[in-house]
Amino acid sequence: MAVGDQTEQNYLPKKKKSETEDDKRRKKIVPGSLLKAVVRPGGGDSSPVDGDQVIYHCTVRTLDGVVVESTRSESGGRGVPIRDVLGNSKMILGLLEGIPTMHKGEIAMFKMKPEMHYAEIDCPVSAPENFPKDDELHFEIELLDFSKAKIASDDLGVIKKILNEGEGWESPREPYEVKARISAKSGDGHVIFSHTEEPYFFTFGKSEVPKGLEIGIGTMARKEKAVIYVRKQYLTESPLLHIDQDLEEVHFEVELVHFIQVRDMLGDGRLIKRRIRDGRGEFPMDCPLQDSRLSVHYKGMLLNEEKTVFYDSKIDNNDQPLEFSSGEGLVPEGFEMCTRLMLPGEIALVTCPPDYAYDKFPRPPGVSEGAHVQWEIELLGFETPRDWTGLNFQSIMDEADKIRSTGNRLFKEGKFELAKAKYEKVLREFNHVNPQDEDEGKIFGDTRNMLHLNVAACLLKMGEWRKSIETCNKVLEAKPGHVKGLYRRGMAYIAGGEYDDARNDFNMMIKVDKSSEADATAALLKLKQKEQEAESKARKQFKGLFDKRPGEITEVGSEIREESKTIEEVDETKDNDDDETLEEEGATTVSTERKRKWSEKAWPFLKNVMLQIGIQLGVVLIGILIFQFVSAKFT
């Protein structure tokens, strides 16, 4: 940035901070309604600000010195100081304005008019019973401590004060295994228990410690030390820590010694990744989240009593690691999902159900169908995809072509979701590519159109014909005469029973490019066949609907409903795209489409039937009108 730009930026108007409710309340303060006298000076130069937790004793007296209420035990209170978070807690106006003027350890006397305490209009704090809220009063405040607060619960029932910062960004969560040293004191400072030598071990999410403590620990980093303030509503019973349920609040001092990452990958407890040895780097920034080339050692075991080992790369592969590219379906889905969340050098134990293990993947010897397995995986390292930043146009297109070719291979293997992901990855990268001349622009545009149509082909194979149409539209909106776009969209229209739209697209192909007439004619023949099949299906399914007497119409309706229950089981067509190829690949795929939704299949039949119903109703209405006319004529 140039110096002139920097100077100009310094003089740009700053965004005005929005006014808070507390700011609005402060504007109502009348001079002389709040007076302060320092009884004992505090230490240091700093004072609390919004976002700080303040801990203080408060004694309220009349101007004659009679104690109205107090937190101090010697003045009739419980001995438990008040904890508030400036800017978050509901406070009387006098303290909201007065406490930020104090230093730690200071004792001050605030003389308040009624409107500065509980007589304030719309005061957010209710006055205690029998409190003289219409009187001028003295509030003696001792500011015991203040510090930055981490609010762990919206109702301020759990607040954390950091004593020593931890390491890294990761915090424990369900179902992580936690190792922590924990001590506890009541709100008045009495020690409940001290466990500073041997740490506690517990699992997140199993209610082994009070709820508030678990919430607070969930905000901590490894080796962090903190005080977690927990109010009564979060002091739930737990088997590991016994807390008196009569206590109003407890202060837990916690040192998070270690935690073991345990991840429920599916959220239902079936696919679990448990870290055995930490890796190098920060989670998740240094994990192979993107498609990468990975190198791993692994041991596969059956989930039986013997933990039978069916494969060990160190033994069965002569200590040579397995190397594979993620995002290509080269390993079981559960295996790949977990390795994407590993750090280099990490060892993890993965427990996997059969549908994410070998039921949908070639089974190794010794693994039966429906077998649950465990893998012990060590991520040795990985190579990330080449960064396109700084590459020239030709290099970028070469990289794009490599990824597209991989997608085409996956498509031919019937791995449509994986293929789609490859095409979409290139399309995302293309958002940052700027061709420099007309030739580059044409190459870039043609490639992008090709990728969109490949995505559309994947969606069609996956049964998502509507999304396939929407994707084709991205090409046709910019280039209405794109022949392959018209063909692909026409096929998607056929899949959805939108036969008129399909016919329009195929006819448009012939109009814009005579060389496509053979393909368009073949598509029109296929369309005609589909229409005939749909018509025949409709006649068969609704046979007898108009032959029934009026009293029998309900019975016919029930027949229709019975037929509709089984419509999803009817394979009305073969693969719509037997002759269809991906751009420049020239190879047909060997895979059947997923079953479409009932509504998508049934619509052409229902449309035909509704037309017939309309005709029949019209005939009936005309008959009624003629009858009424004749009757009127002869009466």
From Swiss-Prot:
Remarks, miscellaneous: 'Pasticcino' means 'small cake' in Italian.
Protein name as catalogued: Peptidyl-prolyl cis-trans isomerase PASTICCINO1
Annotated spans, Disordered: 1-28, 569-593
First-listed, main subcellular location of the protein, grouped into a coarse class: endoplasmic reticulum
Known EC number: 5.2.1.8
The protein's role, per its UniProt record: PPIases accelerate the folding of proteins. It catalyzes the cis-trans isomerization of proline imidic peptide bonds in oligopeptides. Essential protein regulating cell division, adhesion and elongation throughout the plant development and embryogenesis. Required for the spatial organization of apical meristems. Involved in the hormonal control of cell division and differentiation mediated by cytokinins and auxin. Regulates the function of NAC089 transcription factor by controlling its targeting to the nucleus upon plant cell division.
Phenotype caused by lack of the gene: Plants fail to develop apical hook in the dark and exhibit abnormal embryogenesis from the heart stage. Deficiency in lateral root formation and abnormal patterning of the embryo apex, which leads to defective cotyledon organogenesis like small and thick hypocotyl, finger-shaped cotyledons and small fused leaves. Ectopic cell proliferation in the presence of cytokinins.
Superkingdom: Eukaryota
Pfam families: FKBP_C, TPR_6
Location in the cell: Endoplasmic reticulum membrane; Cytoplasm; Nucleus
TPR repeats: 400-433, 449-482, 483-516
Topology class, membrane: Single-pass type IV membrane protein
Species, as recorded: Arabidopsis thaliana
Encoding gene per record: PAS1
Feature: compositional bias, Acidic residues: 569-586
Subunit structure: Interacts with calmodulin (CaM). Interacts with RPM1 and NAC089. Interacts with the elongase complex core members KCR1, PAS2 and CER10.
InterPro entries the record matches: FKBP4/5/8-like, PPIase_dom_sf, PPIase_FKBP_dom, TPR-like_helical_dom_sf, TPR_rpt
